[in-house]
Structure formats: C-alpha cells, structure tokens
Amino acid sequence: MAIESIKNRFAPVLAKREAEALYRRRPLVTSPQTAEMQINGLQVINFSSNDYLGLANHPALKHSCETIQDLSYGSGAAHLVTGHHLEHHLLEDELADWLGCERALLFSTGYMANLAVQQTLMQKGDWILADKLNHASLIDGARYSEADLKRYPHLDMQALEKRLQKAQQENRQCLIVTDGVFSMDGDCAPLQTIQALAKTYQAWLFLDDAHGFGTLGEQGKGTLAHFNLTPDENTIIMGTLGKAFGASGAFVAGSEVLVETLIQMARPYIYTTAMPPINARVARTALKQVQQADAEREQLKRNIQHFQTGANQLGLTLWPSDSAIQPIMLGRSAQAIQWSEALKQKGLWVTAIRPPTVPKNTARLRVTLSAAHTAEHIEKLLQALAQCQDDFPSSNT
C-alpha cells in the first residue's frame, strides 16, 4: 500500500462533506453569551445556546471571577498530585448534598466523565445497554470499555427489557445508559420504567442529565426529580456545569464506593490536570443561582409553550419535546442549511443539525430556548419561520 500524505487522504473526504452539505464551521462569537449576541459579525438573537437559565453572563458569576486574587489561575497538577483545591472539594460536597447522593466527583468535561464511568466500571463479558440516540460521548465511552455494547431503539422499553432478560439468563452484569433529556431531540427518557427495570434485573443505571440539570425538577435537580424519583446505590448521575449552570466542567454523583472507584481507577480522571480552582468557585456560585431560579424555570416553561403554540399554528413538524430543546424536522441537510442561513440574515441564529450528528434524512433546525428570551424574541423567530415556509417549501413542514 502506498504511503499517503495527510492532504491526499483527507482532502477528498472534506470535499465530499462540502458537496453533501455536511461540512461544519465554527461560528465566531465576539460578545458575551446572552440572548442577543454578535456571531460572525452579525447582531443576532441566539436560539442555539444551552444557556437555558440565562446564567452565563449573570453578574453573580462574573463577581466570582473577580475573587481570583487568593487563588492561582491554573491548578498546576492532577487531582491526585497537588491539583485538588479546597474549591473543588467544596463544590463536590455541595453537588452531592443537592442531589441526595453520598459523593460527587468533578471532571473537566462531560465527555471525560462519560468515558470514565463506562471504561472503569464495565468489564469483559458485561453488557452496556444504551439508547440508540444517546449522546456521542456515551457511545464512545461504551466502545472504549471492555464490555459488549447492546443498543436498543429509542425509548423502546420492551426492547430494553428483552435485553435485560437475556443478560439475566446469561448471568451478565448490565449497565443501562441513557440521556435524561436527549440533546438533539429534546424528549425525556421514561426514567420511572427504566429505574424499575434496573431494580428488577439488578442492573446499574447511568444517567447523563446534562440537559436536565437546572431546568427540570425541584430546584432544578434534573430528570430524576422531574419524575419524583431518587437515586439509589446503583444509580450513577452525570451532570454538566456549562449548560443551565452557565459555568464550566462536569461531575459524576453516586455512592461512596462509586466515587472512590473512579478516583482510584478512572484514567480520564487520574491522567489530566484539574480544572482551575476559580472555575470551581464560579460553579459553586452558579449552583446557588440554579437552586434559587424558580422564576427563571417558570419563564422558560412559558417560552417553550409560546414557541410550541406558534410553531404548531404554522404547521411546522416539531419533535415531541417539552424541554428547552425544540427541533424543527426538515429531513434534507441542504434544506436545513437553507433555512438556517435565511434566519441568520433576519438576525436569528438557529443551528442546522445534520448527519452524522442525527440519523440520515432527519436534518433539523435545533431551536433551544432560554429564560432570557423575551416574547418579542420568540415572535420574531416565528415570523421568520413562516417566511422560510413560503420561500423554501418542504414536505416535512
């Protein structure tokens, strides 16, 4: 086989992506993260952020940043060397107390946390039972473990139970892995059923609640709380601090034994530098804001209802979602880009989501709503979507 240059191998791949309307580009932001922003030189209303409560630019978080004088910025080392600061420790304790778990453990990103849990806990011969629409980091974490990955159709509880029954017959340890709120669809996992199945078949449950924390449940405790459920000793929760919290980082919460096992054995935790202590301090402030954000959660609900009512009146095809994530299904990637670009020219930033992020022929506009959006923002979006329907008719709308 001839040796290739990087250019010769990948230039055709990139060209193919461009031709198929699958090429991705990074928007350049030149303003704070708010409902109204400057992106790629345009002044726009942002409907693509995960800043669900409008905390990313909150004065309390900014004030926390200004208290850095008693800290170094960098942590200087991994947690197990000299990088574990008191601010990290306090944040972990406060997150655990908030969720009613014995312990919590910080990670720099949700991706690292999802890799760590599955790589560490699951061994050869075990089964990971995963929803087919789980986030990419959950899929990667399963693939990088030694366990066998068994994916079940989206939200199909009968299919999940059949796999659990087979695993029980073969005496296999199972980990059920699911998003709480699915990031590209906005629908919720039926956690009452999933938790009951986990208990019946003695499986462990790993819940990625990145998009549920802050927005759902009492005090924003997430999808479990939304369904009036509590974690048990075999429940593992992953949450992120960069979405509704408006900060950065992630955590895993669960039992004492779980967290100590991750500290001792999780490679993505052990072999990386700890997040800056100031990030943990800001996240502690964000946690207090989230706990007190009942008014923002109510405003977010009103915004979701406002958008859904208007979109349904227009006859747009919405994915069944009651969360802040409201996908408008278009089907073809080219159509999704066409609509997205037209909206940008009207001062509205709505991202087109295309394969491979979502299945083939399910390209969509992913509208994400925030408590920071006003009724006027949403009306402007609905009017522009109506214009897109006239300008670019689609069989999916």
UniProtKB/Swiss-Prot annotation:
Binding-site list for pyridoxal 5'-phosphate: G110, Y111, S183, H211, T240
GO MF entries: 8-amino-7-oxononanoate synthase activity; pyridoxal phosphate binding
Aminoacyl-tRNA synthetase as UniProt keyword: no
SUPFAM superfamilies with a match to the protein in the record: PLP-dependent transferases
Residues the record lists as binding substrate: R24, H135, T357
Keywords per UniProt: Biotin biosynthesis, Pyridoxal phosphate, Transferase
EC assignment: 2.3.1.47
Pfam families for this protein: Aminotran_1_2
Pathway stated in the Swiss-Prot or TrEMBL entry: Cofactor biosynthesis; biotin biosynthesis
Top-rank lineage group of the source organism: Bacteria
Named cofactor requirement(s): pyridoxal 5'-phosphate
Swiss-Prot/TrEMBL GO biological process terms: biotin biosynthetic process
Modified sites of kind N6-(pyridoxal phosphate)lysine: K243
Catalyzed chemical reaction(s): 6-carboxyhexanoyl-[ACP] + L-alanine + H(+) = (8S)-8-amino-7-oxononanoate + holo-[ACP] + CO2
Family, per entry: Belongs to the class-II pyridoxal-phosphate-dependent aminotransferase family. BioF subfamily.
Record's function text: Catalyzes the decarboxylative condensation of pimeloyl-[acyl-carrier protein] and L-alanine to produce 8-amino-7-oxononanoate (AON), [acyl-carrier protein], and carbon dioxide.
HAMAP family linked to this entry: BioF_aminotrans_2
Subunit note: Homodimer.
Protein name per UniProt: 8-amino-7-oxononanoate synthase
Gene name as annotated: bioF
